[in-house]
Amino acid sequence: MSQGAKVRRPGCDLPLPVVRALRKLGQDIRDARRRRRIPVAVAAERASISKTTWLKVEKGDPGVLAGTYAKVLFVLGLVEKIAQLADPANDSVGLRLEEERLPRRIRHKKGKPSGGL
């Protein structure tokens, strides 16, 4: 590597709200593991990851693969939460935008049969 080259750390260009959300996720994972009284070594073994990687997850490290976070949540019995993350039913912004695009009035064209009774 040349002298002027910089090594970019994963996550250094993430927006602050993303960094905070990952840290909170890591803390929540740590709390869940501790409530279950599972030692880090045992939890990491169950997730087929190293103890070091598990600790990175608990710190909310953005360099850890999303699949690793999913395995950790599976080990803790929380994997069903992943499916709800971007569920359209919980997307208040998307639902509001969709509602704004709905037509105010619906008119039937003359001469064509309507789809109703």
Describe each model-derived feature in a short phrase.
Residues 50, 61, 76, 89-90:
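The DNA-recognition helices of helix-turn-helix-type DNA-binding domains
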Residues 37-55:
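Short alpha-helical DNA-recognition segment
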Residues 61-75:
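Short, basic-rich loop-to-helix N-cap that marks the start of a DNA-contacting helix
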Residues 10-35, 83:
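A short, Lys/Arg-rich alpha-helix, primarily the initiator
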Residues 29, 40, 66-69:
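Helix-turn-helix DNA-binding elements, focusing on the entry/boundary residues of the two helices
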Residues 83-117:
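Short, charged recognition helix plus adjacent turn
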Residues 1-8:
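Intrinsically disordered, low-complexity and often Lys/Arg-enriched segments
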